[in-house]
Amino acid sequence: MAKNITVDNFEKEVLQAAGPVLVDFWATWCGPCRMQGPAVEKLAEEGYNVGKINVDDEGEIAERYHVMNIPTLIIFKNGEEKERMVGVQSKDLLESKLKALA
């Protein structure tokens, strides 16, 4: 299951994580976000480091990373943003980007 990322654990779970971390910025009311959810959860089940940030609850993080549209998926590595995708993405595409940064 993807980790729920908050302002309290963002530093530890994302910025200080070993290896790449896929972060899904989403909201409960967002239809495309609900479509993206299963692919993100499947990657987490397969052992990839995946977190989800609810932009309504954690607006500070979304603002810090200039997330203007959702879903936005950002891959971080070594505390830095390495890849950003806006809109629904396939599991295969996300997995290939995570593998490339491993």
Where are the predicted features?
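Conserved Rossmann-like nucleotide-binding pocket used by diverse enzymes
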Residues: 6, 26, 51
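Non-catalytic, surface beta->alpha helical segment in thiol-disulfide oxidoreductase systems
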Residues: 77-102
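Conserved acidic residues
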Residues: 54-56
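Hydrophobic beta-strand anchors of alpha/beta hydrolase catalytic cores
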Residues: 22-23, 50, 73
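Short pre-active-site segment immediately N-terminal to redox-active cysteine/selenocysteine motifs
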Residues: 18-21, 25-29, 69
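Typically the conserved alpha-helix immediately C-terminal to a functionally engaged Cys/Sec
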Residues: 32-46
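A short beta-strand-turn-helix
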Residues: 3-21, 59
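Structural micro-motif
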Residues: 59, 65-74
